From Swiss-Prot:
Protein name: Chaperonin GroEL 2
PANTHER family, sorted: 60 KDA HEAT SHOCK PROTEIN, MITOCHONDRIAL
GO cellular component: cytoplasm
Gene: groEL2
Gene3D superfamilies, sorted: GroEL, GroEL-like equatorial domain, TCP-1-like chaperonin intermediate domain
Function of the protein: Together with its co-chaperonin GroES, plays an essential role in assisting protein folding. The GroEL-GroES system forms a nano-cage that allows encapsulation of the non-native substrate proteins and provides a physical environment optimized to promote and accelerate protein folding.
Subunit structure: Forms a cylinder of 14 subunits composed of two heptameric rings stacked back-to-back. Interacts with the co-chaperonin GroES.
SUPFAM superfamilies from the UniProt entry: GroEL apical domain-like (SSF52029), GroEL equatorial domain-like (SSF48592), GroEL-intermediate domain like (SSF54849)
Location(s), subcellular: Cytoplasm
Class of this enzyme: isomerase
Binding site residues for ATP: T29, L30, G31, P32, D86, G87, T88, T89, T90, G414, N480, A481, L482, D496
């Protein structure tokens, strides 16, 4: 395929036009009074959304040179979303500001490589300053504020996420799903849940709900297939003497063993229920061990020298309650094994840090959540499909912001943290001796004003005036774009996760620096649209003759 090539200033100007086209579309959504963007879809109704990264992903420019610039900013938004889960619009605004200031200096003769070094030094200084200013999330009120601000000042969503975090702890899993109803609801599954149900409907104890429920059961765990009832006799005798229900989790239970358990249950001799072990291979063994730690039992496995024939009540786990449907099993354990569970979570967390696989990371995080306390599901409802998608994106952003805040703490929101941190660059700039490095630091210092200016502009205020009023104020003092007041933002609950601010700055500076140092731009030449096929002469119908009517000449 043929290539189009641009050199020198032309290449950088084309990239800047692409950056501006995308950033100008995205930045109108920034802040509590940010507007929406309507996205036309090839199929279905248009979407009206307020989510920066979703808007950025949809934009493709006609000019291939400009489109390359837009694609680079898409990468900024996507990277920030991946790392911090929120802050994509802030990252886009910062990238645009750094590119604009940087290219002005490059056009004036500054060395882009040296400018880049100055930008990198400035960002490193700011990252340290953000970490120093961050305050840990102390209570539920802080979580509620962060979630509400990120969801577009939706207090209902803020409260829902705060409730979810309180119920499943910071290690729990919180997911967002679309609901079939109009209401948005929180559903919490306490205990450990896995996707395996009872092996026979004859185990059911509640016929109306078609579930098995037992209080205070014992739990037998094995990685073996059980086919003969003789394998279970020693354990069943111990359980019968104890007078407690028994949950059996095994690779499989079939034939005589399953039939005997069903008959004993039907006759009221012994309350039992059998389910297959979740997952496969090594992951199955790991999850069985998780259940063993949670319930204080042991996995009966030849790998550790245990067999069913030798098993007794000492290897059985204990739970407060079990609820089993045809598809899922939920085990709610007590706090007796809290120390062992904490040690197991720490062990899984070490594995999480070592893995490079996204799939493994997701599965390990799920295991931590199930051990730590459970899973919460926020079911999003809305009157229309368009509103549902917009609301779901906002709630996902709020959830990601909350996780980031718990991880690295919070700083004052509303764009004021970046503005006030510009003063941290003064001493760095004074310590540098190379003029263009100083310029690089100055570029970042000016760009730090951009998010606050845009938030104010979107709220109908004059951004430049707001920036000047706040420049020399206390660190926590800022502009509340929702009310138009200047106030202590921390006291007002307007907070940003430090991780989001840090990631937005780092990702924006990284891509913007690459644009500044670009000298040649090579893109694919667009292929011409294929011409429409020419209209034929309908040769198959020449003369429109009608067979059998040739003798009908004109009189």
């Amino acid at each position: 395929m043929a290539k189009l090539i641009l050199f020198h200033e032309d290449s950088r100007q084309a990239l800047e036009r692409g950056v501006n086209a995308l950033a100008n579309a995205v930045k109108v959504t920034l802040g509590p009074r940010g507007r929406n963007v309507l996205l036309e879809k090839k199929f279905g109704a248009p979407e009206i959304i307020n989510d920066g990264v979703s808007i950025a992903k949809e934009i493709e420019l006609e000019d291939p040179h400009e489109n390359a610039g837009a694609r680079l900013v898409q990468e900024v938004a996507a990277k920030t979303k991946e790392i911090a889960g929120d802050g994509t619009t802030t990252a886009t605004v910062l990238a645009q500001a750094i590119v604009r200031e940087g290219l002005t200096n490059v056009a004036a003769g500054a060395n882009p490589i040296v400018l880049r070094r100055g930008i990198e030094k400035a960002v490193a200084t700011l990252v340290e300053a953000i970490a120093a200013k961050a305050q840990p999330v102390a209570d539920e009120a802080a979580i509620r504020s962060i979630a509400a601000v990120s969801a577009g000042n939706d207090d209902e969503v803020g409260q829902m996420i705060a409730d979810a975090v309180a119920k499943v702890t910071k290690d729990g899993v919180i997911t967002v799903e679309e609901s079939k109803s109009l209401a948005t609801e929180l559903e919490v599954v306490e205990g450990m849940q896995f996707d395996r149900g009872y092996l026979s409907p004859y185990f059911v104890t509640d016929q109306d709900r078609q579930v098995v429920e037992y209080d205070n059961p014992l739990i037998l765990l094995t990685d073996k297939k059980i086919a003969s009832i003789q394998d279970l006799v020693p354990v069943l005798e111990d359980v019968a003497r104890a007078g407690r229900p028994l949950l059996i989790i095994a690779e499989d239970i079939e034939g005589e063993a399953l039939a005997t358990l069903v008959v004993n249950k039907a006759r009221g001799v012994l309350n039992t229920v059998a389910v297959k072990a979740p997952a496969f291979g090594d992951r199955r063994k790991a999850i069985l061990q998780d259940i063993a730690v949670l319930t204080g039992g042991q996995v009966i496995s030849e790998e550790v020298g245990l067999s069913l024939a030798d098993a007794n009540s000492s290897v059985l786990g204990k739970a407060q309650k079990i609820t089993i449907s045809k598809d899922t099993t939920i085990i709610v354990a007590g706090d007796e094994n809290k120390a062992d569970v904490a040690a197991r979570i720490a062990q899984i967390r070490r594995s999480l840090e070592e893995t490079d696989s996204d799939y493994d990371r997701e599965k390990l995080q799920e295991r931590i959540a199930k051990l730590a306390g459970g899973v919460a599901v926020i079911k999003v409802g809305a009157p229309t499909e368009t509103e549902l998608k917009n609301r779901k994106l906002r709630i996902e952003d709020a959830l990601n912001a909350t996780r980031a805040a718990i991880e690295e703490g919070v700083v004052p929101g509303g764009g004021t943290t970046l503005l006030h941190l510009a003063s941290a660059l003064t001493s760095l700039q004074a310590s540098l001796t190379v003029a263009d490095e100083k310029l690089g630091v100055e570029i970042v210092a000016r760009a730090l004003e951009a998010p606050l200016r845009q938030i104010a502009d979107n709220a109908g205020a004059e951004g430049s005036v707001v920036v000047e009023k706040l420049r020399d104020k206390d660190f926590n003092f800022g502009y509340n774009a929702l009310t138009g007041q200047y106030e202590d933002l921390v006291a007002s609950g307007i907070l940003d996760p430090a991780k989001v601010v840090r990631s937005a700055l780092q990702d924006a500076a990284s891509v913007a620096s690459l644009i500044l140092t670009t000298e040649v731009l090579v893109v694919d030449q667009p292929e011409p649209e294929p011409a429409m096929p020419a209209g034929g002469d309908m040769g198959g119908m020449g003369g429109m003759g009608m067979p059998g009517m040739g003798g009908m000449g004109m009189m």
